[in-house]
């Protein structure tokens, strides 16, 4: 694991924490998880197992600290590392394509998987303030759309910045 990679992933985690904090909760304390975009970006740019583990754990802890979901700390800590490795597995299937379209498809699938993991773990550990299907439809699906649109906008910008800087070697 390189220091450059850690620094960039730390920046992604910080940006994700800021986004996660400012998005207001709705429907039983649930809110779209903007932290996922930054976690996914870290995985797309630095696809190594140790990086996936680090960014998954860090985003899980930060999400747990900033959650608006009642007793959502443990489900967040479970969700992020599991989702990080699921996303990484999907990435390995589509490794040849580093295009924005592939990132968008991976983001929508990753967000939906993350929502399923979070809601399932919350259901088993603390219960849900509403039905699984209602929360999935009202929070996870809109979050998948929002995250995908955000990834389509942000990912090419980050790639351009890294390409123009000395960090692009770290992102290969």
UniProtKB/Swiss-Prot annotation:
Disruption phenotype: Cells lacking this gene grow on 40-fold higher concentrations of the tryptophan analog 5-fluorotryptophan than the level that inhibits the wild-type strain. The chain crosses the membrane at residues 7-29, 49-71, 104-126, 136-158. Keywords: Amino-acid transport, Cell membrane, Membrane, Transmembrane, Transmembrane helix, Transport. It is a multi-pass membrane protein. GO terms for biological process: amino acid transport. GO terms for cellular component: plasma membrane. It is found in: Cell membrane. Induction: Its translation is regulated by tryptophan-activated RNA-binding regulatory protein (TRAP). The keyword Nucleus does not apply. The keyword Iron does not apply. Pfam families: TrpP. Belongs to the vitamin uptake transporter (VUT/ECF) (TC 2.A.88) family. TrpP subfamily. Probably involved in tryptophan uptake. This is Probable tryptophan transport protein. It comes from Bacillus subtilis (strain 168). The lineage of its organism: Bacteria, Bacillati, Bacillota, Bacilli, Bacillales. The gene is trpP.
